[in-house]
Amino acid sequence: MRAFMMMVSLLVFVADAIREGLRRLTGRRAEAKCVVLCYHSIAARRRVRFARQMDLLVRCARPLGAETRERLSPGGRYAVVTFDDANENIIANALPELSKRDIPATVFVITDKLGRIPDWQNFGTDFTEDERTMTIEQLAKLPSRLVSLGSHTMNHAMLTSLDLSAARREIEESKRKLEAMVNLPVRTFCFPYGAYNEALLGVCRAAGYERVFTTEPVLALRRPDEFVVGRVWVDPTDWELEFRLKLAGGYRWMKTPVRLVQRMRRMFAPTNAR
């Protein structure tokens, strides 16, 4: 399945190249492309592979921060790096590599799950028994020049499975708690499991978030004020071609399958699922 997905993405990439060539032939500039990468855990044994991915990123795109309001230049290639769940191995294994290359990143924090072994659904392959999320002290010491923090709710709740008042509490209180922890404004929010709807978007706007992130692998930041931003799932274990295609936006065809999976999760998730 992974190889099949990569081959479809390669076809998308080739089609993009043909389209851009035709635009140049007719005197038009290529469209800007930006992708937001969604990482989770970066284990020590994966640091070298992560570093190689960051080398590819700076060669193929210009890094941007998740809070940017920059208008993308026609023909430009851009990438944003994010990490969900605030695993502490990011500190030792990801931040040094990001700092070397001057790549900004956003870490999405689950405010009531700090300093503990993850007990929610494990998406990644790098978690070990002693894996923990960052503590409040570790969050406060993250270099603000390089790292911004966003909310990922209090409990990693699937918000679409909660009643709206409970979901509102997860969204609003996580922002308030995180701001109190680090004494900095929290402007971004990331939906656990990528599950959201229009009502939740309204709650996020009312709570004061300036941008929210999903797991739909679409091209991002087409407008400076874009509120709902998609991301593509990446992992240090990705094959090089696989990562290059994700970086080029080749996986955006996966938007429909991702939405289908989210719909099925909503159908089968128990009420008040965590």
Model feature map: region roles:
Residues T111-L114, T153-N155, W233:
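Short, flexible active-site-adjacent loop segments at beta-strand->alpha-helix junctions, enriched
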Residues L37, I42, S148-H156:
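Histidine-centered catalytic micro-motifs
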Residues T106-T111, V147-H152, T214:
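Non-cysteine beta-strand/loop elements that form the S-adenosyl-L-methionine
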Residues R116-D119, A157-L162:
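A short acidic, helix-capping loop that chelates divalent metal ions and anchors anionic groups
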Residues D102-G124:
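A short, conserved beta-to-alpha structural element at the edge of catalytic cores
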Residues R29, Q53-R62, P96-I103, R132-S151, ...:
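Acidic (Asp/Glu)-rich catalytic clusters
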Residues M1-T82, N87-N93, S161-R274:
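C-terminal active-site subregion of NodB/CE4 polysaccharide deacetylases
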Residues A17-R24, G124-S144, E173, P217:
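Alpha-helical scaffolding within the catalytic cores
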